[in-house]
């Protein structure tokens, strides 16, 4: 399973959800899914998270998506920020905003009672404190 940044929403023009909005194209010499115009020009992506603000996905991820071997979820800025704040309050861990997207996607997924879920809690949220504060006005 993978999570993409939906920014302000996939229908707003301010998103980075390549599997939702992208088409096959070439970027940096690799054929992959790419957010682009009809004539192949890269579309400016948007995400509150700088690490997810990219107009494409890697060729391996594109292949996994196209062959149905991976499920991709898209998460808005607001949902990611709420998940990051919730993790901070419940566990005392401030996640990087990139990782907060993964926690927010849990609400979209279905699990069995005996499933084991692993989330790679990468990055440090202290670098994102200003963004969390601006977003939540805490």
Q: What role is predicted for each listed range?
A:
Residues 15, 105-138:
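Catalytic phosphate/nucleotide-handling subdomain of diverse soluble enzymes
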Residues 2, 96, 118:
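Generic enzyme active-site microenvironment
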Residues 2-93, 134-138:
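Active-site/ligand-binding loops adjacent to catalytic centers
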Residues 7, 101, 126:
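Short, glycine/acidic-enriched loop or turn micro-motifs at the edges of active sites
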């Amino acid at each position: 399973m993978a999570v993409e940044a939906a920014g302000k929403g996939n229908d707003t023009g301010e998103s980075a959800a390549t599997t939702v909005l992208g088409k096959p194209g070439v970027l940096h010499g690799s054929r992959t899914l790419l957010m682009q115009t009809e004539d192949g020009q890269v579309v400016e992506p948007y995400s509150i998270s700088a690490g997810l603000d990219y107009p494409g996905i890697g060729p391996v991820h594109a292949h996994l998506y196209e062959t149905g071997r991976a499920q991709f979820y898209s998460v808005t800025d607001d949902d990611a920020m709420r998940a990051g704040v919730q993790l901070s309050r419940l566990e005392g861990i401030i996640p990087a905003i990139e990782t907060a997207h993964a926690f927010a996607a849990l609400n979209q997924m279905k699990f069995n009672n005996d499933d084991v879920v692993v989330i790679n809690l990468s990055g440090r949220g202290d670098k994102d404190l200003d963004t969390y504060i601006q977003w939540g006005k805490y």
